[in-house]
Amino acid sequence: MDEFQRNSNKHRSWQQFFLYPLFFREDLXAIAHYHHLDRSGSSEPTEILVSNFLSFLTVKRSXRRIRKQNNSISLLGNSDSNKLIEYNKNSSFQLILEGFTIVLEALFAMRSKXFXKGMDGWNSFRSIHCIFPFMEAKLPHSBYISDLRVPYSIHPEILVRIFRRWIRDVPSLHLLRSILHEWKKSFNRENLQKALITQRENTRFSLFLWNSYVYECESFLIPLIKRILNSQSLLYGSFPDRTHFEKKIKDIVLFPPHKISPKKIWLLKDSFIHYVRYGERSLIALKGTHLQVKKCRYHLFHFWQYYFHLWFQPYRICSLELSKTSFSFLGFFMHVKMRPLVVRAKMLDDLFITDLITNELNSTAPIRSILFSLAKEKFCDISGWPISKLSWTSLSDDDIXDRFDRIWXXLFHYYSGSINQDGLYHIKYILLLSCAKTLACKHK
């Protein structure tokens, strides 16, 4: 893959215009075959591994036959002999899809690097461990927050149009269109709207589609929001701490002089924005006025409706004032709380005591949701009373204790920074008593 990316940098025009011949190279099909075996693992029976290898040979022979044909042949035909459209049953389709994804991933990696270099003034963090320190440092200084859910109901033709912006190879686009439409047919009608995006954890191709879709959204969304904030500064009332005045109201000639109040000074308010995303949830923290928040919300609605040609449900974006309401993100309930501090300042021979008020971000663990999950997994009843885990009674004592210990350690490590530690110890009590009842039920 590294060698392919280095060669593609030298011949970028060839890479963009002639991708279709790469999909039928035998070495690319071999790479896809080994990727498919590594993901399946070595625990599969020998018959399945042999079947996959034979399918690889079938794809290899098909690629040779297609190269020798003069007429164009559709890989996804409806003939009885060609079973490539059987997405869940035939691994030949998986290998072709794997090779198709490998080529597109290399192009996507180079395109995303160019996008990151062009975003001046924006710091990008790609680890979940950076989210909480970032939010604790930035959100207390923000006024509003917009909770945005990325739309997942998207038509295959919209994805084809996204790839058309950076791939101009017409045969490759036709192949992508055929794959997307045949893949969409493999889902029933109930899951038709969520087939392309919400199944992203199943295959490498699904994950690539999701990353491409989110990248396309953010590549236009972030500059759009930045342009909205920098387009026009909004005026607001007098603040005595500001010494650098942009304009005074007496200098404005749009109003008669007798209607101007000399006691009120109008200043320009500085605005900034922070953007955080995890999965399909995005948070846009904004320091500014309520009018700027409404303006940003208006442009977000029209961005998805006119750019992606899909209806953006109003409930998918919610604007909140941080000082009055709380919000949920990554399994926490978060709210900004004012914290009063008493500061002693000494100037020459005098000692002053001043009150300083700062904002801090408090996170609360959702104890009720955790109890509901434990009740669903039969660790306790709906009221929170511990019960024995009957499905684990066939395990050894060490395995039972180890499983309970891992559950508690995972919960404690994730929610250890929350302010409601009493609720976490109540969860620990439920797990300990459920473990004891499970062991007692086993040795009864």
Curated annotation (Swiss-Prot):
GO terms for molecular function: RNA binding. Its main location: plastid. GO terms for cellular component: chloroplast. It holds the Pfam family MatK_N. Keywords: Chloroplast, mRNA processing, Plastid, RNA-binding, tRNA processing. Coiled coil: none annotated. The keyword Glycoprotein does not apply. InterPro entries: Domain_X, Maturase_MatK, Maturase_MatK_N. Belongs to the intron maturase 2 family. MatK subfamily. Usually encoded in the trnK tRNA gene intron. Probably assists in splicing its own and other chloroplast group II introns. This is Maturase K. It comes from Chamaecyparis lawsoniana. The lineage of its organism: Eukaryota, Viridiplantae, Streptophyta, Embryophyta, Tracheophyta.
